Amino acid sequence: MRAELNQGLIDFLKASPTPFHATASLARRLEAAGYRRLDERDAWHTETGGRYYVTRNDSSLIAIRLGRRSPLESGFRLVGAHTDSPCLRVKPNPEIARNGFLQLGVEVYGGALFAPWFDRDLSLAGRVTFRANGKLESRLVDFRKAIAVIPNLAIHLNRAANEGWPINAQNELPPIIAQLAPGEAADFRLLLDEQLLREHGITADVVLDYELSFYDTQSAAVVGLNDEFIAGARLDNLLSCHAGLEALLNAEGDENCILVCTDHEEVGSCSHCGADGPFLEQVLRRLLPEGDAFSRAIQRSLLVSADNAHGVHPNYADRHDANHGPALNGGPVIKINSNQRYATNSETAGFFRHLCQDSEVPVQSFVTRSDMGCGSTIGPITASQVGVRTVDIGLPTFAMHSIRELAGSHDLAHLVKVLGAFYASSELP
């Protein structure tokens, strides 16, 4: 099972270079499992025992498995994750012609580690909006092949390179995509015209706009002398999206189960399709009668907010509290912060520990050092937006927000197992 789950994750990562592609990948799996797509613009007619999903902005998704008992009686079991990862996004007018090379201006999305982006074989993917035959359309594109690189400056020309040299995002991150002939002009939108024709057989009248991100073409892989690790891009947080989907599709029981995968977590979640927007609440309200039904159902519900945790790096062990250092392959991590950077409380943490013990899954705890700041997740945002009790958890990871992250190869199976137990649980605290 472990090898199969890990290969499924590797395939999912390869098919999901952007939040748009990740959402499309999740939707394909759901449809193959018999889930029916709902359109927010239409009236919904859901049924007891029904399987549904809904997307927003092509980059966020909510999957719904309705049980036999009413949510007013048993509540919802929700698992939350996010589809976005730090990256470099192409600017609207990106062409930079310098010294005979064509580069594309990029904007940094989220809290990316810059240095790992250098000397990588980069490709480009995302969503393009265009007009064809007088009609406005959007399509996902993925160049797939390596079309760009950000070369490092040789150490002979930068002797301070290994002494904490700061990287200027404006000047040093624009990738090189081509060498220009003397007098040659470049139009990035013409490249998108060609890609639309190549990938979709569409001849666009004009490309109107796009949301495109560079990504590393190197596939994720199982690594380590004994295959102990998984290395790959976007493990934060497609690892949790994949685990939540596997748990939902394979969970036993007959409860009301929800998987929420939202965009824009890395930039604060404040959007119409992010966790700090109305997406989840609006969907849940449409599954319930009017009046006080929503409040009653939510108070019987629980959210597991799944987002990667910081594992103890052997070279930097002092960056962790000595008693709260999660180990790779040590199982899911319960995240705790007294200042509500995580939404975990004693009741929700105790329930998650109970699930892990019953499932024979190891479990760990993370609290940041008292002299360091703490990141956050969709957990507190969703808890405050919807009013649902929440536990923040995640799998331990190295190099979070790098172009290539590292997680334990045993931990995915641990997480899928305990999330499956959560979905199947007939009683919540």
UniProtKB/Swiss-Prot annotation:
Any one GO BP annotation for this protein: proteolysis
Superkingdom field: Bacteria
Protein family per UniProt: Belongs to the peptidase M18 family.
Listed GO MF terms: aminopeptidase activity; metallopeptidase activity; zinc ion binding
Cofactors named for this entry: Zn(2+)
Alphabetical list of PANTHER family matching this protein: ASPARTYL AMINOPEPTIDASE
Cellular component GO terms held in the UniProt record: cytoplasm
Protein name, entry field: Probable M18 family aminopeptidase 2
Any Pfam family matching the protein: Peptidase_M18
Gene designation per UniProt: apeB
HAMAP family xref list: Aminopeptidase_M18_2 (MF_00467)
EC number: 3.4.11.-
InterPro entries: M18_aminopeptidase_2, Peptidase_M18, Peptidase_M18_dom2
Keyword Calcium: no
Keyword line: Aminopeptidase, Hydrolase, Metal-binding, Metalloprotease, Protease, Zinc
Residues binding Zn(2+), per UniProt: 82, 156, 401
